[in-house]
């Protein structure tokens, strides 16, 4: 089944839950989430690490500098090239000290075959993927969820611990305070099996505000 048909089914399902979801889907329009399954596993994980607590624009800027400074052809650096790049150079690209260290750890894990191959990952459930990748130091649940959404394109991921999503969930569900992770999971349970698309729509709420909606 194609991505477009999956998204249409997801939009129809979300719209059928209640008026709030129906209104949000209508205001935002069709889902334009674009995962990149062509990325190697280590690349997808590093991109997820880079994006934490940053805007899309800031993330893209850092990745572009990273590719320019750390590879020979402006493509995403290989694990070997990353290991040959010192923390100071990574910091110049825009990575924090902690993220620089985590990126080195992921690159080393890739070189040591500690990261499953694409074909192996495709056969894994989300629980199996969590168990496998969380063995890599610094790779936590949020990073794996972002990898599952933006690289693998899995449709039923709810990153309930994401701070931005919690803020949007507070507004969307009319809560008096920022929800706990468990509450987000409970509130979005009706969105199964399309929780990734539900998360994407919640992330669009600030854009609606900027448009005055």
From Swiss-Prot:
Family: Belongs to the alkylbase DNA glycosidase AlkA family.
GO BP, sorted A to Z: base-excision repair, AP site formation
Location in the cell: Nucleus
Key word DNA damage present: yes
InterPro entries: Alkylbase_DNA_Glycosylase/TA (IPR051912), Alkylbase_DNA_glycsylse_CS (IPR000035), DNA_glycosylase (IPR011257), HhH-GPD_domain (IPR003265)
GO MF assignments: alkylated DNA binding; catalytic activity; DNA binding; DNA-(abasic site) binding
Known outcome of mutating residue 53 to G: Looses the ability to bind abasic DNA
Keyword Nucleus attributed: yes
Stored Pfam families: HhH-GPD
UniProt GO cellular component terms: nucleus; protein-DNA complex
Species assigned in the record: Schizosaccharomyces pombe (strain 972 / ATCC 24843) (Fission yeast)
Protein name: Alkylbase DNA glycosidase-like protein mag2
Function: Alkylbase DNA glycosidase-like protein that shows no DNA glycosylase activity for alkylated bases. The molecular role of mag2 appears to be abasic (AP) site recognition and protection, while possibly facilitating damage signaling by structurally sculpting the DNA substrate. Stimulates AP site binding to mismatch repair protein mutS.
This protein's UniProt keywords: DNA damage, DNA repair, Nucleus
PANTHER family: DNA-3-METHYLADENINE GLYCOSYLASE (PTHR43003:SF5)
Induction comment: Transcription is strongly induced following exposure to the alkylating agent methyl methanesulfonate (MMS) and oxidizing H(2)O(2).
Binding site for DNA: 53-54, 61, 91, 94, 96-97, 99, 102, 137-138, 140, 143, 163-164
């Amino acid at each position: 089944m194609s991505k477009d048909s999956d998204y249409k089914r997801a939009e129809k399902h979300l719209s059928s839950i209640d008026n709030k979801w129906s209104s949000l889907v209508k205001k935002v329009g069709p889902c334009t989430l674009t995962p990149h399954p062509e990325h190697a596993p280590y690349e997808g994980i590093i991109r997820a690490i880079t994006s934490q607590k940053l805007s899309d624009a800031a993330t893209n800027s850092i990745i572009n500098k990273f590719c320019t400074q750390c590879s020979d052809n402006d493509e995403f650096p290989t694990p070997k090239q990353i290991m040959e790049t010192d923390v100071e150079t990574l910091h110049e690209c825009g990575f924090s000290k902690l993220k620089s260290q985590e990126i080195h750890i992921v690159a080393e894990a890739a070189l040591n075959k500690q990261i499953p191959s694409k074909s192996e990952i495709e056969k894994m459930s989300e629980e199996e993927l969590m168990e496998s990748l969380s063995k890599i130091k610094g790779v936590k649940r949020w990073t794996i969820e972002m990898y599952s959404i933006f690289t693998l394109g899995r449709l039923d991921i709810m990153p309930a611990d994401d701070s931005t999503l919690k803020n949007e969930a507070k507004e969307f569900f009319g809560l008096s305070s920022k929800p706990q992770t468990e509450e987000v999971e409970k509130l979005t349970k009706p969105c199964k099996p399309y929780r990734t698309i539900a998360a994407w729509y919640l992330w669009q709420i600030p854009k609606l505000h900027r448009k005055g909606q």
